[in-house]
């Protein structure tokens, strides 16, 4: 399994576990340091850099993922196509493309920046806090998915109407609507007015 900011530790060359570091930022998104991943999510949370990806098929349907049950943060809930944290110093675009491939086994046929959003979302189930400066990306996926079962429990392509129905009955990540709403202008530009986003 590739070692990425989605995993909590990895083995160094001497066989010891190394913590995954996140990039801490100020309110303007300027890097101010690093923090261990779990520590950055402990209350009250530390503002750190993140990314969220929204991929659509050729019919304008959004690809959702259900987070794997084994994940320590927000397991089993539905969320956007891919989300995560760049390595310190890694460009958010590169991290978004890398993690999308690692989690879904596919590279977007198009990936474009869609702005940023800053939020603070406590997760009542885990007690963790998402205090993020999030870089948003929208794009297209045209290849068959090959999800990593350690990261993803299920996937679904949904229309805007189907998303509204699913969101009313199924659990979603605490950050999902915040990042989707912030990305909507770019989503509408990508999918066109008839898709209903």
Curated annotation (Swiss-Prot):
Q: What is this protein called in UniProt?
A: Isopentenyl-diphosphate Delta-isomerase
Q: Which Enzyme Commission numbers does its entry carry?
A: 5.3.3.2
Q: Does the keyword Nucleus apply?
A: no
Q: Where along this sequence does the record place binding of Mn(2+)? A: 41, 48, 85, 130, 132
Top EC group: isomerase
**This protein's pathway:** Isoprenoid biosynthesis; dimethylallyl diphosphate biosynthesis; dimethylallyl diphosphate from isopentenyl diphosphate: step 1/1
Recorded GO molecular functions are: isopentenyl-diphosphate delta-isomerase activity; metal ion binding
Cited PANTHER family: ISOPENTENYL-DIPHOSPHATE DELTA-ISOMERASE (PTHR10885:SF0)
Q: Which residues form the Nudix hydrolase domain?
A: 46-183
| HAMAP family for the chain | Idi
Keyword RNA-binding among record annotations: no
What reaction is this protein's catalytic activity? Answer: isopentenyl diphosphate = dimethylallyl diphosphate
Pfam family name, one: NUDIX
Annotated family? Belongs to the IPP isomerase type 1 family.
Q: Which terms under GO biological process does the entry name?
A: dimethylallyl diphosphate biosynthetic process; isopentenyl diphosphate biosynthetic process
Q: Which cofactor does it need?
A: Mg(2+); Mn(2+)
Places the protein is found: Cytoplasm
């Amino acid at each position: 399994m590739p070692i990425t900011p989605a995993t909590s530790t990895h083995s160094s060359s001497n066989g010891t576990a190394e913590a995954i570091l996140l990039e801490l930022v100020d309110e303007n998104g300027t890097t101010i340091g690093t923090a261990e991943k779990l520590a950055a999510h402990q209350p009250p949370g530390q503002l750190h850099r993140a990314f969220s990806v929204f991929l659509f098929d050729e019919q304008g349907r959004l690809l959702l993922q259900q987070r794997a049950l084994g994940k320590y943060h927000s397991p089993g809930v539905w969320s956007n196509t891919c989300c995560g944290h760049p390595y310190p110093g890694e460009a958010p675009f590169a991290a978004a493309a890398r993690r999308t491939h690692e989690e879904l086994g596919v590279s977007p046929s198009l990936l474009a920046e869609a702005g940023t959003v800053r939020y603070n979302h406590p997760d009542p189930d885990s007690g963790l806090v998402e205090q993020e400066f999030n870089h948003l990306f929208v794009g297209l996926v045209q290849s068959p998915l090959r999800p990593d079962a350690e990261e993803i429990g299920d996937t679904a392509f949904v229309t805007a109407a189907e998303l509204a129905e699913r969101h009313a009955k199924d659990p979603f990540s605490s950050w999902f609507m915040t990042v989707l709403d912030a990305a909507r202008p770019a989503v509408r530009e990508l999918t066109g007015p008839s898709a209903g986003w």
